[in-house]
Amino acid sequence: VYDVGRVMEECLAIKPDLVFLWDEAWFPFARFHHVYRPRTAMEAARTLADKLRTPAYREQYEASLPRDESTEALLNQRLSPDPARARVRVYATHSTHKTLTALRQGSMIHVYDQDFALKVAEGFHEAYMAHTSTSPNYQILASLDLGRRQAALEGFELVQRQLEYAMKLRDAIDHHPLLSKYMHCLSTAEMIPEKYRASGIAQPLRTGLSNMVTAWEQDEFVLDPSRVTVYIGLTGVDGATFSANG
């Protein structure tokens, strides 16, 4: 999982009116857990918009203006958007049915666009009406409302339980007397180079929730602990063959 806020900051430093469309098809659940939430498009957009309005950021921006504008220097420096020019314009698509409770094809478009009313609203609604049905499936729409309600009431508990089950699955595979001879679950340190992990924490969740919080706050890339990646190189078959015949 990348640092959504950082990506947008550095892109807006180059093109201050850039519009972002984030595909969060498998990430709708993230809004409902405090560790995941800052790396969602909508939360990152709100945080960035608030940040750009503060006098402290203005001072920070002016102090960070590069003295050396050579390509090499710019590539090695974290870029910051100009608060006087940058506009936060962010859209995110969620396939709600994939990780929340909704009927198949139930999905949402989320919008945080400072220029929506002025530049986008009319065209957006026209495009939506042009591509949607005049006979919508109200069962799907109702399931979206139910899924949203369930997530609002029970979301944290469900996500936390999901993390616990994922860790139990990792432990079961890694400590199984037979399975562990041929496969193991890849850790953060094995999948993300050290230079992208400022926290230096090799296995964030396994060493405690507080370490997961630290890693997700500091690292440029993090591993979603609810996703289990199993290395099967010692089985003698590749992933495609294993998937097809397993």
Pin down the residues of each PLM region:
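Conserved PLP-enzyme active-site core in the AAT-like
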Residues: 1-178, 208, 212-219, 223, ...
